[in-house]
Structures are given as C-alpha cells and as structure tokens.
Amino acid sequence: MKFQGLVLIDNCKNQWVVGPLIGKGGFGSIYTTNDNNYVVKIEPKANGSLFTEQAFYTRVLKPSVIEEWKKSHNIKHVGLITCKAFGLYKSINVEYRFLVINRLGADLDAVIRANNNRLPERSVMLIGIEILNTIQFMHEQGYSHGDIKASNIVLDQIDKNKLYLVDYGLVSKFMSNGEHVPFIRNPNKMDNGTLEFTPIDSHKGYVVSRRGDLETLGYCMIRWLGGILPWTKISETKNSALVSAAKQKYVNNTATLLMTSLQYAPRELLQYITMVNSLTYFEEPNYDEFRRVLMNGVMKNFC
C-alpha cells in the first residue's frame, strides 16, 4: 500500500502527514512526517511486532524513569528512544498499526561500510560501553533486547557521539514480579533475531536473558573490528542448526574463536567474551566489571 501523502490520526487526535519512505526492516517501514523531528513506523496490525514495541515504549521507556536511572547509576546517556504517539489506520482490506518516534541519523552499519567494514579498536570499545549501558537499563527493567546489531544502532542527528539502540520488536520480558522466567524451551522462540548474532539460548528456544544480549554484543564487536565469524557464511544459507552448532563449538574456546575471526584479537575482547560464557542463564552480570574491561581497551588506545 502507498502511504505517502496519507494523514494519520494518533491516540491524542494529532495529525501526521506521511512523507517518503526512508527505511524498511523486519519490523515495519519508516517514513518521514510533516515534523522533521519525528518519523512514523508502520506495519500491518496482524504482524504483532509493532504492538510489542508499543507496549515496551509505554511500559518501560518513560523519560522520567530513564532520567532517574541515569542519575542513580551516574551514567550520562542511555541510548533508547521514546514514542511520541501511536495509533491505527484502516484501509479497505488491511488494518495498520503505526508509531511516531524520534528521527535519528545514519545507522552504525552504514558507518562501518563507509569505513571499509572496519572500525578502530578504541571506537569499538566505546560503542560496546554505550550499548552495555543501554542494555543494563533494559535488563534492570526486566527486559532483554534480543536483536543487537549494527543496523539497529543509530547515531543522533546532531551529536554523532550519541548512539541509540532501536527496534524493540523482539524484546522479551525475562523478569516478572522479581522472578526470572524458567529455563523452558518454547519452539515459537527458536532462532529469534538475526541468525549471525542470535545467542545460543535463542537458537534452543529459550527466552533471551541478560547473558544472551551480552553474547550478541560480543559477536557484534568482533564484526565491527573487521572480523569474520566462523558461522558468518553459514548464516547466509539460513541453516540455523549449523549456525547454532558452530557457536556451541566455541563456547569453551574463546581464544580459538577470536584467532579464527580476527587477524588481531584485543585482549579485552577475549576477557569480555570469556566473562559472558561464564554466566548462567539466570545470573545478573557485573556490569561494572564488563565496563571496566572495555574501558581498558579504550584507554590503551587513547591518543
């Protein structure tokens, strides 16, 4: 369906004029609006992923909650955007859900491709810290992201040093009333996320917990350094069983994983992934220790 030119009416009865299409992913299409500060994300209501996003925005991503958390943790920036408005639009045959969200800049994937598919070690460690801060906030609200990757990390339009982790269509609630979800397989959750970066728990059908997000971030940092994961080529075939088996092979062989993936493997990345692999499914990570390890990688490359 052609959306450009349509007028959408949100939950507060405000009108949004849909502009040109500027992005399309697994969880909806993104269009400009008549307000340059915002974009509108649209997908068929039946798909359900935008409803998941909408629920996450309204339950968790409240500006006051984020600001209070930043103060209490002495962290300057949490890379999560908020939702301006939402609503439904009904065409002749299909009903659509839409979200009005902050407009951001280029995604990290585009930045990496523009830099010959490789970022400096210091930059990768800094980005790792930013994403670690962001998922710590999510985890402490009881949610995992489930799809960390460069195309879901977006730069601020003005301050290019600010990064945002976007696309909340695969967020999972792993804590409820202070209790962790049980370690039970759900076939409907098998292989959720982007196959190359999907955590091993997700391959097996378990809800992504804290260690799953940290595992995915480790895979991403290898790729951002210009590395090729042992299962990168296999993931292009969409054979999830082979990808899962390849990842499992390296769980207790972190050094081999890094030597296979990278010409030069930073010691700090070895420490990071080793620490992730030592976590249990239910365990709360020591985020400060993970930050310390990555910051060591930043400082040794400080100019």
From Swiss-Prot:
Domain of life: Viruses
GO cellular component: host cell cytoplasm; virion component
Post-translation changes: Autophosphorylated.
Chief subcellular location: virion
Claim: Phosphoprotein is one of the keywords in the record: yes
Cofactor: Mg(2+)
Keyword Nucleotide-binding applies: yes
Catalytic activities: L-seryl-[protein] + ATP = O-phospho-L-seryl-[protein] + ADP + H(+); L-threonyl-[protein] + ATP = O-phospho-L-threonyl-[protein] + ADP + H(+)
Subcellular location: Virion; Host cytoplasm
PROSITE patterns recorded: PROTEIN_KINASE_DOM (PS50011), PROTEIN_KINASE_ST (PS00108)
Principal EC category: transferase
Bilayer-spanning residue ranges: none
Function: Essential serine/threonine-protein kinase that plays different role in the viral life cycle. Phosphorylates the host small ribosomal protein RACK1 thereby customizing the ribosomes to a state optimal for viral mRNAs (which contain poly-A leaders) but not for host mRNAs. Facilitates viral DNA replication by inhibiting host BANF1, a cellular host defense responsive to foreign DNA. Phosphorylates host BANF1 on serine and threonine residues; this leads to BANF1 relocalization to the cytoplasm, loss of dimerization and impaired DNA binding activity.
Assembly, per entry: Interacts with host JIP1; this interaction increases the amount of MAPK bound to JIP1 and subsequently increases the activity of transcription factors, such as JUN, that respond to these complexes. Interacts with protein OPG198; this interaction inhibits the repressive activity of OPG198 pseudokinase on viral replication factory formation.
Name the UniProt record assigns to this protein: B1 kinase
Species assigned in the record: Monkeypox virus
